[in-house]
């Protein structure tokens, strides 16, 4: 029931992003609406087929062999077999920042990437918990969902940026937005898109925590990993570069130095304390 509700909520939020594109596009007249829809469809298709390549390239990840990482291969193979799913490709990112992510459009085309930092930071039990979380993202099609959400939000930003090029002093009779419409587009469009995208991202992280812990049968292992990652990502954050920001929402922990106040409210990840509390509660129910 919980997963069905979560899936429905995600579908509604994605529908909200798509509707927002159409509403903003309609301010530019029929031509603007057509362009907005075509751009949305094209961006979705591109995100669907290339999300894995884009994320792995952003992290400069390389394929890793079983000879290089036998323990990693063993735990991924065991969990994939237990879930009756194909084994994903495995990659290592050459960065000290501790993190991991999964990417790919479906289980047969998925990849799991661990940074060198997370391999050193976590023990085998904790790393197994992280792998369970990432595999759950794959099995729940969260990579596709987050890629589509990010693509739709990018389209909205494209339309907002385009709005700056439109003269605002004309009337609505010439099939263009008036001053009030332009202000609404530029002020409310990005905010609404961001709020919806964050709601999707946080919802999927909670679900991956729960289903990943269920897959490994060890919620406390993931809770322990999250504690270490919370401290580790603060000490060794990724630099805030555009190429890395495109992949940040896929990672198990916020890879950048945490902000304060409003910036913290707009994080792509749920609060670590809340995630850990949910896992500990889940472990209590299993006892």
From Swiss-Prot:
Active site residues per record: 134
Gene Ontology biological process: proteolysis
Main location: membrane
Membrane disposition: Multi-pass membrane protein
Free-text comment on the cofactor: Binds 1 zinc ion per subunit.
Subcellular location: Cell membrane
GO molecular function, a single term: zinc ion binding
Keywords for the protein's UniProt record, in alphabetical order: Cell membrane, Hydrolase, Membrane, Metal-binding, Metalloprotease, Protease, Transmembrane, Transmembrane helix, Zinc
EC annotation from Swiss-Prot or TrEMBL: 3.4.24.-
InterPro entries in UniProt: HtpX_protease (IPR050083), Pept_M48_protease_HtpX (IPR022919), Peptidase_M48 (IPR001915)
Domain of life of the organism encoding this protein: Bacteria
Cofactor: Zn(2+)
Membrane-crossing residue ranges in chain numbering: 7-29, 33-50, 148-168, 180-200
CDD domains to which the protein is assigned, alphabetical: M48B_HtpX_like (cd07336)
A GO term from the CC aspect: plasma membrane
UniProt: Zn(2+) binding residues: 133, 137, 205
HAMAP family: Pept_M48_protease_HtpX
Similarity comment text for this entry: Belongs to the peptidase M48B family.
Name of the featured protein: Protease HtpX homolog 2
Native source species: Streptomyces coelicolor (strain ATCC BAA-471 / A3(2) / M145)
């Amino acid at each position: 029931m919980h997963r069905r509700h979560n899936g429905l909520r995600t579908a509604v939020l994605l529908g909200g992003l798509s509707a927002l594109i159409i509403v903003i596009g309609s301010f530019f007249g029929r031509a603007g609406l057509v362009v907005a829809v075509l751009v949305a469809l094209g961006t979705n298709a591109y995100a669907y087929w290339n999300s894995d390549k884009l994320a792995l390239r952003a992290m400069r990840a390389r394929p890793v062999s079983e000879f290089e990482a036998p323990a990693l291969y063993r735990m991924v193979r065991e969990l994939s077999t237990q879930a009756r799913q194909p084994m994903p490709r495995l990659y290592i990112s050459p960065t000290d920042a501790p993190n991991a992510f999964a990417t790919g459009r479906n289980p047969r085309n998925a990849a799991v990437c661990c940074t060198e930092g997370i391999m050193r930071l976590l023990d085998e039990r904790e790393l197994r918990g992280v792998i369970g979380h990432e595999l759950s993202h794959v099995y729940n099609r969260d990579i596709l969902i987050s890629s589509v959400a990010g693509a739709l939000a990018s389209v909205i930003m494209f339309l907002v940026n385009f709005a700056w090029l439109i003269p605002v002093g004309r009337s609505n009779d010439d099939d263009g937005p008036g001053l009030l419409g332009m202000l609404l587009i530029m002020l409310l469009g990005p905010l609404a898109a961001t709020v919806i995208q964050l709601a999707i991202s946080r919802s999927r992280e909670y679900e991956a925590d729960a289903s990943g812990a269920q897959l490994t049968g060890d919620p406390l292992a993931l809770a322990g990993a999250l504690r270490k990652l919370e401290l580790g990502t603060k000490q060794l954050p990724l630099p805030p570069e555009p190429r890395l920001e495109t992949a940040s929402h896929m990672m198990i922990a916020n890879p950048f130095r945490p902000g304060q106040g409003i910036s913290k409210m707009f994080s792509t990840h749920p609060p670590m304390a809340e995630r850990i509390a949910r896992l500990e509660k889940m472990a209590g129910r299993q006892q």
